[in-house]
Amino acid sequence: MALLQIAEPGQSPQPHQRRLAVGIDLGTTNSLVAALRSGLSEPLADAEGRVILPSAVRYHADRVEVGESAKLAASSDPLNTVLSVKRLMGRGLSDVKQLGDQLPYRFVGGESHMPFIDTVQGPKSPVEVSADILKVLRQRAEATLGGELVGAVITVPAYFDDAQRQATKDAAKLAGLNVLRLLNEPTAAAVAYGLDQHAEGLVAIYDLGGGTFDISILRLTGGVFEVLATGGDSALGGDDFDHAIAGWIIESASLSADLDPGAQRSLLQAACAAKEALTDSDSVEVAYGDWKAQLTREAFDALIEPMVARSLKACRRAVRDSGVELEDVHAVVMVGGSTRVPRVREAVAEAFGRQPLTEIDPDQVVAIGAAIQADTLAGNKRDGGELLLLDVIPLSLGLETMGGLMEKVIPRNTTIPVARAQDFTTYKDGQSAMAIHVLQGERELISDCRSLARFELRGIPAMVAGAAKIRVTFQVDADGLLSVSARELGSGVEASIQVKPSYGLTDGEIAKMLKDSFQHANDDKVARVLREQQVDAQRLIEAVQGALEADGERLLDAEERMVIDLQVQELTELMKGTDGYAIEQQTKRLSQVTDAFAARRMDQTVKAALSGRNLNEIEDI
């Protein structure tokens, strides 16, 4: 079924006129913009013929410099030149301080706890720095295509959380760009290869960029790109290779590790140059100041082996999550400039048992795929029909239930966009409000998951416990942003929230959440069962105590009351321990000894309801 294209007044396109839309790869090290031209998706070059724009921004007192010239000034003006700003997107001030010496900037905080970089132009947020990069790409596209853009598809790592995705959208808005969609980088690569080769089957997208690593397992069938599983590391990339070589230089040259920002930047530039030279050479001369030495590819491979191994571990986990075997994967697509490193390609080939695909420039493939999707979303028809993309969420979403348990509403690796609803009820008689605690993670207890947001549903009509019906709906849009609503179905009272955390996960937390869920799976199940038994026991105790207070003296003799009190006391004591089986059995015993009491209360209620009524009135009830 075709979608109606609705435009704002004055923006409707002329018949047969293409709407100008682009795909943007906003990368850690480099950025690109691409568009469909004459039926082919291709990157757009600047006036000098360069398609790659270094993600470098230098601030002068009266102007902003972006790209190659800014990158070259990184050593001479390190405090005003910002590199790898993508690593700061959606982060808090405390997060970036943990990176320490890796970031040679002066950070200042604000009321929002967002990190600001102190420059000659004043404090600059990561969103503002990213916006300056996006402005240059927008201007390049409009100059090349000869018109104003209707929008852009901007790619983000699959592991970007809500805060990082929202920060990317904010940067685009600041740059004057209408975001048609945020697209996961691995999915964009699949679009590029799927269109060109009409591939069907299982494909692994190995994306190693400057600052992030993503692995995705996709099923390609008849134009449908379905992401079966994602994984990766939000703090692994070519920058880490540079730091490994820089560490080798410091050790080999007997340098002090406490370098000033300019020296640190020069050191990293020397390391990066050596890394790039070793792509085509077996050895390279590394020079830093008066010191010189030969770095062989073999020695470089040894330096980066732990990082390569980390990436392959994430690959194996993603394959396992997707429910397939390594041998089922028929193609491996390489994305990101860091996949040019020979050892990376060798290791991937060894792990998957086949040579990876590198037919499309790994630096350009993401932007090329994004441009294809942008053209479709802009309403331009393409030969071959529509293209359907099915992204997934990387971490489960849910909410807190009684006992501090995490109830998953949308499991990880669920295709997005998605909406899921689940019904809950009240725990206590007369409960008029419910606290909704939204969580993210894979563990069973809320203490082991990440808190995303809290809100309250008020105005629930007074009822006995369990009578109210509250429907909680989770909606994740195509950009991975979450909104949660809660509605009491009887009265219609409703409350909702859009989850936009003030800052994202710290480096390593995303991978750690998945790792911990695997390591503690059995313990978590045992803990969950215990909590559920404790909650059931507490609910029964409260119900029994309420009944005793209301009708105990009237309906029970002294011996019956003593038996029930003893059973309540024993269950209360057992709940303090960790013997789930004993709690379960004692809960059953308490339920059994109170059966007769419950029956008497029911009889009394029925008698009271029928008292004073005639037969016709009773039949009408």
From Swiss-Prot:
Keyword Thylakoid found: no
UniProt keyword annotations, A-Z: ATP-binding, Chaperone, Nucleotide-binding
InterPro entries: ATPase_NBD, Heat_shock_70_CS, HscA_NBD, HSP70_C_sf, HSP70_peptide-bd_sf, Hsp_70_fam, ISC_FeS_clus_asmbl_HscA
Coiled-coil annotated residue ranges, if any: none
GO molecular function annotations of the record: ATP binding; ATP hydrolysis activity; ATP-dependent protein folding chaperone; unfolded protein binding
Domain of life: Bacteria
GO biological process: iron-sulfur cluster assembly
UniProt function note: Chaperone involved in the maturation of iron-sulfur cluster-containing proteins. Has a low intrinsic ATPase activity which is markedly stimulated by HscB.
PANTHER family for the chain: HEAT SHOCK PROTEIN 70KDA
Entry's family note: Belongs to the heat shock protein 70 family.
Protein name, per record: Chaperone protein HscA homolog
Species the sequence originates in: Pseudomonas fluorescens (strain Pf0-1)
Gene from which this protein is expressed: hscA
